[in-house]
Design a protein with these regions (language model features):
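Transmembrane alpha-helices
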Residues: 1, 5, 19-48, 130-134, ...
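Membrane-interfacial helix termini and adjacent extracytoplasmic/periplasmic loops
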Residues: 20-21, 53-59, 112-117, 159-164, ...
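Cytoplasmic-entry segments and transmembrane alpha-helices of multi-pass inner-membrane transporters
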Residues: 9, 122-131, 187-226
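C-terminal transmembrane helix and the adjacent membrane-cytosol boundary/short C-terminal tail
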Residues: 2-13, 19-20, 52, 79-120, ...
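Periplasmic/extracellular loop-to-transmembrane helix junction in inner-membrane transport proteins
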Residues: 20, 24, 28, 67-75, ...
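Interhelical loop and adjacent transmembrane-helix boundary motif
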Residues: 50-90, 121, 150-161, 319, ...
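Loop-to-helix entry region at the N-terminal start of transmembrane alpha-helices
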Residues: 33-34, 127-132, 162-174, 212, ...
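Transmembrane alpha-helix signature in integral membrane proteins
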Residues: 85-89, 95-99, 161-194, 199-202, ...
Length: 377
């Protein structure tokens, strides 16, 4: 809605439409692509959610997949259920594309005026303030206050938690995953920019699809592929099985995170590269700069903000990622998310308060970093 043109409202007025009619007949239909993207994200997050539905003992496909593998050690059933969940996700995209029926949502960028803000007054102002305050209270103030109260009231749970180990494990995953994701994102984006190779472009486009898949499907698919590939090499060449190198290890976690969040990293770097005109590279080559020197002295400084933003977004995703970490983590390897889940699964809500609070604090630090430093740039 913010990026829509005021010209649309003026067209509605010229057609004799009231404010409400203009909104429902012009503004709302024009915002459909953004609304559909938002609804798709909500639908995918809901379908792939594990912690919430498991805590409330609601039987969903994600909990069934997890139980099939962890509780019954039945990888075949886990794969079959994963396929069903994947089918529903693909069905959402297909139905949305069919419903568009070739509709176009382009706007002429010339002469566009932003929609002016409306200063609310009286009852409207009170209602808007109360509504937003209730949302903020229910979603942040109340749960954080309750967790803080439990942490203070039950210090024995705090003393039983290895705080530094949880921090180091969480930050280790964040650092390694961010390093590999950002490095490969630079390699693919710079390769597409320099080589114009269609195969590399297609592979890059295909590789960003992992973010649309629920983490639990990726974890099960990862275990299935590694097990199959290891058994294949063992049967052909007589190699020792290397399953343990990838399954139940930090290496496996980082690879799974890479597949899951490469889209986030790739598109973040790509958006920065789209703002660097190709003529800048051509002028650098005319001045005798090599491709590496152009990359290191021009591209990297220009993309500094994008690198920081991508790193923070990856960190936010990884610290709260639960299904992948639960299934692929090493033995006795805990993060704040898995520790909070393990306590909640035992119905020890008071014990789960402290790791949950630490998770919120880390997320708040990352979000404040984005708002204060990156966005101000």
């Amino acid at each position: 809605f913010v990026f829509q043109s005021h010209n649309l409202i003026e067209v509605g007025k010229n057609l004799g439409l009231s404010s409400y009619e203009s909104f429902f007949k012009i503004i709302l239909p024009s915002a459909r692509p953004a609304i559909v993207v938002g609804l798709s994200l909500v639908a995918m997050e809901t379908l792939s959610d594990f912690g919430t539905v498991d805590f409330f003992s609601i039987s969903t496909l994600t909990t069934a997949i997890y139980n099939a593998w962890i509780s019954f050690d039945d990888l075949t059933t886990a794969n079959q259920l994963s396929f069903v969940l994947l089918f529903f996700i693909l069905l959402l995209f297909v139905l949305e594309n069919i419903s568009r029926r070739g509709a176009k949502y382009h706007q002429n960028s010339k002469g566009n005026k932003p929609i002016p803000k409306i200063q609310l007054a009286g009852g409207k102002s009170i209602f808007a303030t109360c509504f937003c305050s209730i949302l903020f209270f229910c979603s942040f103030i109340f749960p954080v206050s309750q967790m803080t109260y439990w942490t203070i009231k039950f210090p024995k749970y705090f003393q039983d938690i290895n705080f530094w180990s949880l921090n180091m494990n969480t930050l280790l995953l964040v650092f390694l995953s961010s390093l590999f994701l950002i490095t490969f994102s630079f390699m693919t984006n710079y390769g597409n920019r320099v080589s114009k190779n269609k195969l590399l472009s297609y592979l890059s486009t295909f590789s960003v699809s992992g973010y649309a898949l629920p983490g639990i499907i990726l974890a099960v698919a990862f275990i299935t592929f590694i097990s199959w590939f290891s058994d294949l090499l063992t049967s052909i060449f007589g190699f020792d099985s290397f399953k343990n190198v990838f399954i139940g290890s930090v290496v496996g976690l980082v690879i799974a995170y890479f597949v899951r969040f490469f889209s986030l990293s790739y598109n973040g770097i790509k958006s920065g590269y789209s703002k660097i005109n190709n003529s800048i590279d051509e002028n650098a080559y005319l001045l005798g700069y090599s491709k590496f020197k152009t990359f290191s002295t021009i591209h990297l400084p220009y993309l500094k903000t994008n690198i920081l933003l991508v790193g923070v977004l990856i960190a936010l995703e990884i610290i709260k990622e639960l299904p992948i970490t639960l299934i692929l983590r090493p033995f006795n390897f805990e993060t704040f998310a898995t520790k909070a889940y393990s306590y909640a699964a035992q119905d020890l809500l008071e014990a789960a308060a402290f790791p949950s609070l630490c998770l919120i604090i880390w997320a708040s630090i990352f979000i404040l970093f984005i708002s204060k430093y990156i966005l101000s740039e």
